[in-house]
Amino acid sequence: MVDSTEYEVASQPEVETSPLGDGASPGPEQVKLKKEISLLNGVCLIVGNMIGSGIFVSPKGVLIYSASFGLSLVIWAVGGLFSVFGALCYAELGTTIKKSGASYAYILEAFGGFLAFIRLWTSLLIIEPTSQAIIAITFANYMVQPLFPSCFAPYAASRLLAAACICLLTFINCAYVKWGTLVQDIFTYAKVLALIAVIVAGIVRLGQGASTHFENSFEGSSFAVGDIALALYSALFSYSGWDTLNYVTEEIKNPERNLPLSIGISMPIVTIIYILTNVAYYTVLDMRDILASDAVAVTFADQIFGIFNWIIPLSVALSCFGGLNASIVAASRLFFVGSREGHLPDAICMIHVERFTPVPSLLFNGIMALIYLCVEDIFQLINYYSFSYWFFVGLSIVGQLYLRWKEPDRPRPLKLSVFFPIVFCLCTIFLVAVPLYSDTINSLIGIAIALSGLPFYFLIIRVPEHKRPLYLRRIVGSATRYLQVLCMSVAAEMDLEDGGEMPKQRDPKSN
């Protein structure tokens, strides 16, 4: 009885219930994610997720360890170049493996379900909900604090506004994909314009002769290997997000062209903006002011913009809002693909029958973020995943090299020289080693969180469905059925129109 119910739910995409067919094709319209992300949307998604609040609030991490303006700018440039290498590797992976899910999909393709599940488990427990909750809290703090100029804003006020922000963006992305991309475009423009204002103000000051901070700019530099490593690590953390578009590969129009082109446009934009923004900061503020500031851009605005200094706190809030939207889009697709591959409950990979949005996965992601908002010391959780993040990014690139060897004749619309993935792999070894050395306890906790998924994988995921406990099958079947009705959703069909794609994998049957 239970099994038949589940198969009935899964078969419903074949029912002729798609009223939105445009008449171009004789059969019923497929229920799958639609290709609605254009080149411009792709650029805004990457830029919007890479440029968060960090460049406004705390770009001083690089300066602390480099100890000079000159060396810090060099490290920002090196961090940008390294990120370009990683983004180019992901461009090849995204055009070769045309599945959403970024590193999860690539690890699954190269190494199978076990490592892919551990990557998904880490994202589910720590990376995605923690980062989204923190971005939402930062947004709320910058919106609420001006109302309490002489004291700290109430804890409940910022958390409630953060929750409202998560709910609003979840609703927008549930309604229409186009609404989500429109929000992303608008808020990306806003944050870029704010940084351009900072850059222009700095250049004007520099043109007026305020160049004293750049005299002997390398004086006092710390060339110790450990300090340079930590400075570079801080820079690379600010550049994270270049893989955002790979989470939505199946929704990109003409991905063979637009995915690598979006990456190729976005990376120079962000790198140049980061370097010039720091030049502007260094022109106006001395090292002591920067290191003492809790929000460098706000300190900069107080000295430059006068009565218009409110622009920067507002820009930080807008930047967080856009970054949160990009994170919600990416994370929901990760959970969607994880469900489709059998690593999460089937209900999460369903799609709204009229709007063609992954409503269940968006709701699941939103609920997880709201739960983590209830954690009072949530900022501590962010320290646990640096090791895991870079480990799985590096493992994806190792998978790229492995697939080059295992499947040399596989169609690759974009094929890089092996120089790029090899260099990136060597650098990720460094990025994995740095947190183990500098933040050993938190890194070990992060590893333990990742390994906590082992019992779940071997006792549930790897067990064939008919051998799972009857009560569990009944609960999952009932939840799937009710969620399907509640969300007006059916199981998504796999998009196989691109050559080389494999049909839906279910982990218990793999290997």
From Swiss-Prot:
Result when mutating residue 54 to V: In LPI; failed to induce sodium-independent cationic amino acid and sodium-dependent neutral amino acid transport activity; does not affect heterodimerization with SLC3A2; affects expression level
Location(s), subcellular: Basolateral cell membrane
Outcome, altering residue 386 to R: In LPI; failed to induce cationic amino acid transport activity
Induction entry: Expression is stimulated and enhanced by IFNG/IFN-gamma.
Transmembrane segments: 37-57, 69-89, 107-127, 133-153, 160-180, 186-206, 222-242, 259-279, 304-324, 383-403, 416-436, 441-461
Tissue: Highest expression in kidney and peripheral blood leukocytes. Weaker expression is observed in lung, heart, placenta, spleen, testis and small intestine. Expressed in normal fibroblasts and those from LPI patients. Also expressed in HUVECs, monocytes, retinal pigment epithelial cells, and various carcinoma cell lines, with highest expression in a colon-carcinoma cell line.
Reaction it catalyzes: L-leucine(out) + L-arginine(in) + Na(+)(out) = L-leucine(in) + L-arginine(out) + Na(+)(in); L-leucine(out) + L-lysine(in) + Na(+)(out) = L-leucine(in) + L-lysine(out) + Na(+)(in); L-leucine(out) + L-ornithine(in) + Na(+)(out) = L-leucine(in) + L-ornithine(out) + Na(+)(in)
Membrane topology according to the record: Multi-pass membrane protein
Residues bearing carbohydrate: 325
Gene Ontology cellular-component terms listed: basolateral plasma membrane; plasma membrane
Outcome of mutating residue 413 to S: In a breast cancer sample; somatic mutation
Superkingdom: Eukaryota
Known outcome of mutating residue 334 to R: In LPI; failed to induce sodium-independent cationic amino acid and sodium-dependent neutral amino acid transport activity
Gene Ontology BP terms: amino acid transmembrane transport; basic amino acid transmembrane transport; L-arginine transmembrane transport; L-leucine transport; regulation of arginine metabolic process
PANTHER family: AMINO ACID TRANSPORTER, Y+L AMINO ACID TRANSPORTER 1
Similarity field: Belongs to the amino acid-polyamine-organocation (APC) superfamily. L-type amino acid transporter (LAT) (TC 2.A.3.8) family.
Record's disease association: Lysinuric protein intolerance: A metabolic disorder characterized by increased renal excretion of cationic amino acid (CAA), reduced CAA absorption from intestine, and orotic aciduria. On a normal diet, LPI patients present poor feeding, vomiting, diarrhea, episodes of hyperammoniaemic coma and growth retardation. Hepatosplenomegaly, osteoporosis and a life-threatening pulmonary involvement (alveolar proteinosis) are also seen. Biochemically LPI is characterized by defective transport of dibasic amino acids at the basolateral membrane of epithelial cells in kidney and intestine.
Name of protein: Y+L amino acid transporter 1
Lineage, top ranks: Eukaryota, Metazoa, Chordata, Craniata, Vertebrata
Gene expressing this chain: SLC7A7
